[in-house]
């Protein structure tokens, strides 16, 4: 009887530790950070969208997404990057024309 209680206690502790490990691992899901910025020119016609990296990242970045699904990290302070973001915003959310 004592060994059955010990076995149940061990299984309970093992199950609890697996739950904690699984929950801790899930906190980083979906977080993408840039380590460096791309310095070259990016043709506008190859871009499908953009997003800003999480505030949890050490380096603030704008990430452009290409038609092939690639992510390109860019400096949000760069003038070309700002113009590209404005362009993408204008084609994604066109301003209604007055009649």
UniProtKB/Swiss-Prot annotation:
One of its GO terms (molecular function) is chemokine activity. Gene3D superfamilies: 2.40.50.40. One of its GO terms (biological process) is inflammatory response. The keyword Cell membrane does not apply. Expressed in thymus and also in spleen, lung, lymph node, kidney, small intestine, colon and skin. Its main location: secreted. Belongs to the intercrine beta (chemokine CC) family. Chemokine, which displays chemotactic activity for T lymphocytes, preferentially Th2 cells, but not monocytes or granulocytes. Therefore plays an important role in a wide range of inflammatory and immunological processes. Acts by binding to CCR4 at T-cell surface. Mediates GM-CSF/CSF2-driven pain and inflammation. In the brain, required to maintain the typical, highly branched morphology of hippocampal microglia under homeostatic conditions. Transmembrane segments: none annotated. It holds the Pfam family IL8. It comes from Felis catus. One of its GO terms (cellular component) is extracellular space. This is C-C motif chemokine 17. CDD domains: Chemokine_CC.
């Amino acid at each position: 009887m004592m060994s059955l209680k010990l076995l149940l206690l061990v299984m309970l502790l093992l199950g609890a530790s697996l739950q904690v490990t699984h929950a801790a691992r899930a906190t980083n899901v979906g977080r993408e950070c840039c380590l460096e910025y791309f310095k070259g020119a990016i043709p506008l016609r190859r871009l499908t969208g953009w997003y800003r990296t999480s505030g949890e990242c050490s380096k603030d970045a704008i990430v452009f997404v290409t038609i092939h699904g690639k992510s390109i990290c860019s400096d949000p302070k760069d003038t070309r990057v700002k113009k590209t973001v404005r362009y993408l915003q204008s084609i994604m959310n066109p301003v209604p024309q007055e009649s």
